[in-house]
């Protein structure tokens, strides 16, 4: 049972557009009961125990969904500890995230299994952002494009290994990053599709033709577009070219202005269907960390002046971002992306792509995971399942 609430005097960004000067009623089931224009508010009759909260002319949006991150606040999936995952949940709620997919690095198989089991154990115990399931980045990826993943964990395609990872996840693995060019990938892709696991092309040296072959067996999404993948060349489109050319290919994007230049983000939005673009952070354990040494997947890290983490021993190697979804939202809006499009990328699209029923859009009957922002895009409140878990109205 949730507390009944009414949010008034806001622009409601539904996930398919925006409605100015509107309000949202959250019912006792933790669902969106109604969306109404403020001209009708005086004629509305709500139960007497309903709390009325004034958005003050700000924005009422779906809670943001981060479908790819490794850590935040000094806690990460590499800790192999349910406590760390639950701490991530708390810290993500502080920055407007209502749901997330903790992402497991490529590592030794035993380490990956421990990480997966820790996330599964944490599920259902959250006091902040809900854990939707597990994102596994590897291990069937290209050594040439390994990036910050542990090269010792990179493996050839092996269905027995895949099954060990799936079994460790107890049905909670939602998606996995793979290199489509690897031998045996067709069989693995069909096997994954039977189990409802979304495969993303990433950490890949695939040719344009390899990506087309992957699409034929259901590899229709891609990991942190432009990063850790074969480049666009006028004689070989590579993975980057394939994702740009093929309208059905979906892609993640890290909107920190460092991993991808803002003008390329704008180009992507111009040339690709908005439905197929997902905002992520790829944030690391030391994101928003206060004090202590900075490490990510065991690699000593340094926070560069541009806000991205680089390997301490190799400042040319990006190992992930220090981004939050809320800052990513502000960034793309600064790059002249309308807020309704930004919210679609941060909430609606990941919910649809990963089959998250009744999430990612503000429509009656959907789960009341709601983010309230002021006019300057600062967080005022976060509701999860209709419960006000972060209150900054005062």
PLM features per residue range, with description:
Residues 167-290:
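Active-site core of metal-dependent hydrolases
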Residues 55-114:
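Metal-associated gating/positioning segment near the N- to mid-region
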Residues 1-6, 12-61:
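Histidine-rich, glycine-flanked metal-binding segment
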């Amino acid at each position: 049972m949730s507390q009944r609430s009414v949010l008034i005097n806001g622009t409601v960004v539904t996930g398919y557009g925006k409605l100015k000067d509107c309000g949202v009623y959250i019912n006792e089931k933790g669902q969106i009961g109604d969306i109404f224009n403020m001209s009708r508010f005086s004629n509305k009759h709500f139960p007497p125990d309903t709390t009325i909260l004034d958005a003050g002319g700000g924005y009422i949006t779906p809670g943001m969904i981060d479908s790819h991150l490794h850590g935040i606040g000094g806690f990460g999936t590499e800790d192999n500890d349910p406590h760390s995952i639950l701490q991530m949940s708390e810290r993500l709620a502080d920055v407007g995230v209502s749901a997330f997919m903790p992402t497991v690095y490529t590592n030794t198989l035993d380490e990956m299994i421990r990480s997966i089991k820790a996330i599964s154990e944490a599920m259902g115990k959250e006091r902040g952002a809900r854990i939707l399931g597990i994102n596994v980045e590897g291990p069937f990826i290209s050594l040439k494009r390994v990036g910050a993943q542990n090269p010792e964990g990179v493996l050839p395609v092996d269905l027995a290994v895949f099954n060990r990872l799936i079994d460790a996840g107890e049905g909670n693995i939602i998606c996995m990053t793979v290199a489509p060019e690897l031998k045996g990938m067709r069989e693995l892709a069909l096997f994954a599709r039977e189990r409802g696991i979304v495969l993303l092309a990433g950490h890949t040296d695939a040719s344009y033709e390899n990506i087309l072959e992957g699409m034929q067996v259901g590899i229709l999404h891609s990991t942190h577009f432009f990063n850790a993948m074969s480049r666009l060349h006028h004689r070989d489109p590579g993975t980057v070219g394939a994702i740009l050319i093929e309208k059905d290919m979906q892609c993640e994007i890290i909107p920190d202005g460092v991993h991808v230049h803002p003008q390329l983000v704008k180009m992507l939005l111009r040339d690709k269907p908005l439905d197929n673009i997902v905002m992520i952070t790829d944030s690391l354990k030391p994101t928003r960390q206060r004090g202590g040494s900075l490490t990510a997947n065991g690699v000593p890290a340094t926070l560069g002046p541009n806000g991205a983490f680089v390997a301490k021993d190799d400042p040319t190697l990006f190992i992930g971002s220090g981004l939050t979804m809320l800052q990513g939202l502000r960034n793309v809006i600064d790059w002249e992306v309308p807020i309704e499009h930004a919210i679609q990328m941060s909430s609606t699209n990941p919910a649809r792509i990963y089959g998250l029923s009744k999430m990612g859009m503000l429509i009656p009957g959907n789960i009341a995971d709601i983010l309230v922002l002021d006019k300057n895009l600062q967080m005022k409140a976060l509701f999860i399942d209709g419960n006000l878990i972060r209150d900054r109205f005062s």
